[in-house]
Design a protein with these regions (language model features):
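Outer-membrane beta-barrel proteins, especially TonB-dependent receptors
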Residues: 1-162
């Protein structure tokens, strides 16, 4: 029995960052992509050797944007409000011709998130949430987030997260 795979992987990304002169506003836009092509041969076992050849292609790309506003003081201490959106798509095609098997799958995930993090040298408190819509799931998924941080000294960080 013999096995062999040959891969061709290409990818890249771009990012743009903007910082306001007073650094209270930060904005970024990003995009990346990766393409994979794989030719494979997974030994025949008890089948015809020509049945064991296959090919896989996968194209994945994502794009998004994020905005951060830094408050000098929001309610009880300085904080950063972060909001953003993302979109991710994965297109997979996997063929094993001799086994009469093909996987043709396209996954789209759109996301939006919002969080606020209050912080100073000793304390940090973060609360936020994320909404994800996956094309293979009927409903929107909400993921809450909360974090409490205490730094009694410069070298000790205690965290409680949800």
């Amino acid at each position: 029995m013999a096995e062999q795979t040959e891969h061709s992987i290409n990818g890249g990304g771009l990012k743009f960052d903007y910082f306001s002169p007073n650094e209270n506003h930060r904005f970024n836009v990003f995009a990346s992509a990766q393409h994979i092509n794989r030719d494979s041969y997974y030994g025949p076992g008890d089948r015809d050797p020509l049945d064991a050849y296959g090919n896989t292609t996968d194209l994945n790309w994502m794009a998004g944007s994020q905005y951060v506003y830094s408050f000098g003081k929001c309610i009880f201490m300085p904080s950063d409000l972060t909001a953003g959106i993302e979109f991710n798509q994965d297109k997979l095609e996997d063929n094993m011709w001799g086994y009469n098997r093909t996987v043709d799958q396209k996954v789209n995930i759109g996301s939006a998130f919002l969080q606020n993090e209050w912080k100073n040298d000793h304390w940090g408190f973060l609360i936020g949430g994320r909404l994800d819509k996956h094309n293979l799931i009927d409903h929107v998924i909400f993921s809450p987030r909360a974090n409490l941080r205490y730094n009694p000294t410069e070298n000790i960080n205690l965290r409680l997260s949800y």
